[in-house]
């Protein structure tokens, strides 16, 4: 079959983008042709992929999205496909991969009423309704149990159109047999002594991921503990505002900001704790990547995958609603207790052996390839 995938932006380090790539490659592995429509493509194009970057420009993102939809529709009219799979919400999809939460719910609960008069709101509300309305034919790949009831509440989407997928952690994130050697080499490279503690926070979109909360928690540590603790923040974002916050808090060389990179498994093995106090997070793939690497996790409860950390007993989950003081206390407790960290690491590795945390691409491909076009 000829399959078409559409997403607004591809870059190698985004969670949505990595999920797209693994699903598309799985469909290709099963013998199907892959075409991709996008506004921005950064990185290599896999052999056999046809990638089409829309030649459209607009002042506002929502207008650019609409132009992409129109340009794609015109191309599909000339060169039809058997399935159209979207990783952002838009009209005309056969299958939608629900990487993002419910826009309408956020608009009603987190925004004031004036927001709903803007063109931006109308665009995203209309595009979400095109996917989730009862009369829509789009099948929905869900990766978060938390969001499904919200879509049903706002749109009355029939239950049978939802397909809940298991997580899709890449096997290269699992701790290898030589994990101790990799950890030692990593810590030598970054000049980390045995008594120093390394926190990592990983993910693009520093504001949403709660980097400000992490910096406050680091600054609140007792002086002797703070002196031997470092934080590395890794992701595709402009760190300027957080660098200013870090300086204002007197953290100096204790904090490093690094761009998104392909050797994340080394950081998961070399660190002592993953901190992830996100404001909102549909899933949080990095939580499970840490779990399967044997890295203890400190996470906010709003993250869709936070329940895995609790089930595996591989770290601590903050209460909801979030309180900075609890984050400060939990961080201090986790850093001071070497025995507990070792136990959380063992628990994560044991959970990684028994739970299905890996088969999302295969399950997604099953749904995509099974759908008959309306």
Predicted ranges, named:
Residues 120-143, 149:
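Membrane-proximal helix-turn-helix segments that form the acceptor-binding/catalytic region
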Residues 18-22, 197, 201-220:
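A conserved mid-protein helix/loop that constitutes part of the nucleotide-sugar donor-binding site
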Residues 296-300:
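Short hydrophobic beta-strand element within catalytic cores of glycosyltransferases
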Residues 242-260:
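Nucleotide-activated donor-binding/catalytic signature segment of Leloir-type glycosyltransferases, i.e.
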Residues 39-41, 202-206, 229-243:
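Glycosyltransferase donor-sugar binding loop
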Residues 279:
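Aromatic "clamp/platform" in nucleotide-sugar-dependent glycosyltransferases that forms part
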Residues 340-354:
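A short, well-ordered alpha-helix in the C-terminal region of glycosyltransferases
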């Amino acid at each position: 079959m000829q399959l078409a995938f559409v997403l607004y932006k591809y870059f190698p380090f985004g969670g949505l983008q990595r999920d797209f790539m693994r699903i598309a490659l799985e469909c290709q592995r099963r013998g199907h042709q892959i075409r991709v429509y996008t506004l921005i493509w950064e990185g290599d194009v896999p052999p056999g992929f046809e990638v089409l970057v829309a030649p459209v420009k607009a002042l506002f993102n929502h207008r650019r999205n609409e132009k992409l939809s129109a340009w794609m529709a015109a191309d599909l009219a000339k060169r039809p496909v058997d399935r159209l799979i979207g990783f952002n919400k838009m009209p005309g999809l056969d299958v939608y991969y629900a990487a993002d939460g419910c826009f309408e719910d956020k608009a009603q609960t987190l925004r004031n009423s004036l927001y709903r008069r803007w063109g931006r709101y109308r665009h995203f509300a209309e595009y979400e309704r095109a996917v989730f309305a009862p009369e829509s034919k789009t099948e929905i790949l869900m990766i978060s149990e938390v969001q499904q009831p919200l879509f049903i509440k706002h749109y009355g989407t029939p239950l049978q159109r939802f397909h809940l997928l298991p997580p899709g952690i890449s096997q290269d994130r699992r701790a290898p047999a030589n994990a101790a050697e990799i950890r030692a080499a990593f810590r030598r490279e970054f000049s980390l002594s045995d008594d120093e503690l390394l926190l990592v926070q990983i993910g693009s979109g520093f504001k949403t991921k709660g980097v400000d909360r992490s910096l406050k928690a680091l600054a609140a540590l007792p002086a002797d503990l703070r002196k031997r603790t470092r934080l590395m923040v890794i992701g595709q974002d402009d760190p300027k505002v957080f660098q200013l916050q870090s300086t204002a808090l007197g953290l100096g060389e204790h904090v490093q900001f690094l761009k998104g990179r392909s050797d994340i498994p080394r950081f998961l093995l070399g660190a002592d704790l993953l901190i992830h106090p996100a404001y909102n997070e549909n899933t949080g793939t990095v939580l499970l990547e840490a779990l399967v690497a044997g890295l203890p996790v400190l996470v906010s409860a709003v993250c869709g995958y936070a329940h895995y950390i609790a089930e595996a007993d591989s770290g601590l989950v903050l209460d909801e609603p979030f309180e900075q003081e609890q984050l400060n206390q939990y961080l201090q407790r986790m850093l001071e207790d070497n025995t507990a960290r070792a136990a959380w690491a063992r628990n994560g590795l044991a959970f990684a052996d028994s739970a299905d945390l890996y088969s999302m691409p295969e399950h997604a491909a099953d749904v995509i390839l099974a759908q008959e076009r309306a």
